[in-house]
Amino acid sequence: AVEEFLTHYADGRETWLDGVRAYARAIYGKVLARNDRRRFLDKTPRYSMIVPELSEIFPEARFVILLRNPLAVLSSELRTYIKGDWPLLADFAPDLLEAPARLVAAREVLGDRLCELHYEKLVEAPAEELQRLCRHLGLPWEPGLDDYSETPAPRGRFNDPVGVHRHRRPSSDSLETWRELGRSAQTRAFALAYLDALGDDTVRAMGYDPAALRAALLHIAEAVAVEAEALHALCGDESLDGQVLSRLAALRDGVHD
């Protein structure tokens, strides 16, 4: 209906584009003026769904896409938001299932207006990656730009609820936490199914090796099985079993040696 209205009573799609641009100028312009700034960074995972539209609306804008190991993304969502409440996963289906392929497709849409970063490189060599980003954006590099400890956190709920407040700079502490997905049969099967749903072509296009990710999950499963066998052997002796149970009970009750 909107398209027909614009076609018959205005200048078609260009009228709609002008309207959206005017809306954005009003909103972002007020924020910039109030904070005495010249540039505005707007970031949300859901923008992956409308990259072509954003490119058309803002033809001079620069775009930054941050890619991450898809299993690390899955692990983060499960730990941060789902927390065992599995029906909540439906709310994150677009981010988990659709966004990766759309981000890959954005390369063709955005061309040289796109700067692509990988999370792993960013946390391991933040200064180098941020210098590359600054060059793309035409911004001067300032030493210490990777130290965000003095930067005020965004007001409201629009920030990282878990990790960012624990560090002064990008940290690699969480690089390997995704491997925990391999420790239980349920999460391991879910992670493997997730890789299948994304498709190997998409995972590779993101810069990751799907075969290596699957192998890592299975290797962790084998290690867990060895641990279980060792524990079973330890507890097979009745006296040792009693000692183990007593120790666990003491730890539960806060009793320490």
Describe each PLM feature range.
Residues 16-34, 48-49, 53, 57, ...:
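PAPS-dependent sulfotransferase catalytic domain
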Residues 9, 39, 87-88, 118, ...:
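Residue-level detector of alpha-helix boundaries and kinks
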Residues 8-12, 118, 142, 184-187:
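Alpha-helix initiation/capping motif
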Residues 1-42, 47, 172, 194, ...:
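PAPS-dependent sulfation machinery
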Residues 104-107, 135, 139-257:
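PAPS-dependent sulfotransferases, especially Golgi type II membrane carbohydrate sulfotransferases
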